[in-house]
Amino acid sequence: MLSLIVLLEKETLRFSQMVLAWGNGRVGASGGIGIHFPNGELQDISLEFDKGCCTNQRTELYAILYAIQYIDDNFDLNKCKVMIKTDSTYSVNSITKWAEGHSRNDWCKRTGEPIANREFIQEIYEYYQNFNIDFEWVEAHTGQTDSESIANAQADFLANSAAKRAARDKKICRPSSSGSKRNSREFYCEKSSKQVYNTPYRSKSRASINGFPIDDDFEIELVKRRSDN
């Protein structure tokens, strides 16, 4: 039985300008994900987040979805068991606890308001229902020197590389010195009811450059069964 470990990282950079936080949901936030295969079964991924409003939660979900799709493109998910380990309780609960009820309610809350991040959650949930995929919450950033922690650091590097590249390439919006206080703070993402439900980009492109500090950890363990032949 082939055991394939996939480590993911996501990063959302926060910019400071005029004593305002430029990141995590505001215009100018930049993010990236990193996917690392310690045993080299697949090529590592360092990818910018370019799916609209950039927040921690959206980048977390995108990292999970992209990894599942990347594995699906290279392996037969019908013959695989995928374990997704993450320190993001939001991501775990969104799929394993809340998605079932939301799907029956046309992806709306009990109040009738559309759920946030539907474009990621709905597709992840479809994979979760149709394939052998499980989620587990784990503690992150243990600071250990074991092989798994070292591999995790490489995933950190990949994510930070992508986030830094995204920050460099993105035009950052800043208020003018004469702008009103109100305008200078209007850089938050629109509410979930106004989000554009775009489709995550299924790319096979890879890139890697210098890194940055990290945020949340994702680990995916894939067990691929041997051929019956």
Swiss-Prot record:
GO terms for molecular function: metal ion binding; nucleic acid binding; RNA-DNA hybrid ribonuclease activity. Binds 1 divalent metal ion per subunit. May bind a second metal ion at a regulatory site, or after substrate binding. Coiled coil: none annotated. GO terms for biological process: DNA replication, removal of RNA primer. It catalyses: Endonucleolytic cleavage to 5'-phosphomonoester. SUPFAM superfamilies: Ribonuclease H-like. It comes from the Viruses. InterPro entries: RNase_H, RNaseH-like_sf, RNaseH_domain, RNaseH_sf. It holds the Pfam family RNase_H. Keywords: Endonuclease, Hydrolase, Metal-binding, Nuclease. Its cofactor is a divalent metal cation. Its EC number is 3.1.26.4. A divalent metal cation binds at E60, D87, D156. It is an enzyme of class 3 (hydrolase). The keyword Nuclease applies. Residues 42-164 form the RNase H type-1 domain. PROSITE patterns: RNASE_H_1. Belongs to the RNase H family. Endonuclease that specifically degrades the RNA of RNA-DNA hybrids. PANTHER family: RIBONUCLEASE H1. This is Probable ribonuclease H.
